[in-house]
Amino acid sequence: MRMFRNDYSEGAAPAILDALVRTNYEQHPGYTEGDAHCERARQLIRDFVGRQDVDVEFAIGGTSANIVGVTGMLHDWEGVICTKDGHINVHETGSIAACGRTVLPTQDADGFLSPAEAEKVWQFQTSTGRHMTRPAMIYITDTTEIGGVWSRERFDAICDWAESHDLKIFVDGARMASAMTSPENDLPIQHIARRASAFYLGGTKNGMLFGEALVIADPDLKRAFPFLIKERGGLMAKGRLQGVQFEAAFDPANYGEAGEPLYYQLARGANACAVRLRDGMATLGYEPYGHSASNQQFFVVTPEQEEAFAEAVGSETFYTLDDGRRVIRFVCSWATTKADVDESLAFAKGIA
């Protein structure tokens, strides 16, 4: 049975691998500097997000992108506001703190950073002037940690709040492609590009072997990135490998019949399988945890079901509820098929 543990268990989508093989014997400068593939990928991304004034840089993975993106826009006496389940707060081993910056979590429980909760953190942190870490940025993820997709209204509300407090806006886009192709999405990437100080387009979790593309509008991060990515151990000597992959992902030659890049096509397939899984599990009587129209789906199960699913399909446990039941996660990837979903549903039916 296929695993539903995460969206990076497989290697890479065939079109991505084909591009790597086709260019394998080419020789290019290192470190993403001046090679033809990185430069073309940068321009393709600028064109796609609708901004020619941004820098496009590459990081090896999400943690590296977050470290450089967050610390490059903050002084060491400043902090970043995020939700309590934000990735930089709970899943990156204190990397922001290790770089001398402070994470300031809110009590938002649904994965979305709200103006009301962010205001509480702001009021507390600024209540004694120079004696506390000063908030200087907000950090959000699209999709959220529990699969939520930001609406344009909600995104604009938190951006308006941040701008009214002169805070920078960083969007973790490890699963940006899933968010953008969700059937419930009304927030285009071009609008994110207009409002965010920086964001990134995740490749690792969307059919690439590795790599994230940071889109940087903030002048401080533009200046800092080349140095921070090296200092923090994230600069690849064979940087052209990142350029080749993102070039293939946004190359017009790989656009589908609907006129969207390969980057979106891969995510759209994963989302479709995830929605099929969600609906099938609900039909079998499994309780969804929250609401997700992206490639991550969460369900409330008994401890016995938790163990059975973990062994059969690799589901991971995210929370233990007060009544002892577990919240487990299923993730679909570019490689997931409808047949894979149906096989897992047949198993789920047997233990319902």
Region annotations inferred by a language model:
Residues 3-6, 56-60, 82-83, 140, ...:
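General beta-strand structural signal in soluble alpha/beta enzymes
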Residues 13-62, 84-89, 95:
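Conserved N-terminal alpha-helix of the aminotransferase class I/II PLP-enzyme fold
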Residues 75-77, 275-350:
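Conserved C-terminal alpha-helix-loop-beta "cap" of PLP-dependent enzymes
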Residues 134-144, 149, 187-294:
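Active-site C-terminal subdomain of aminotransferase-like
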Residues 150-182:
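Catalytic PLP-binding core of fold-type I/II PLP enzymes
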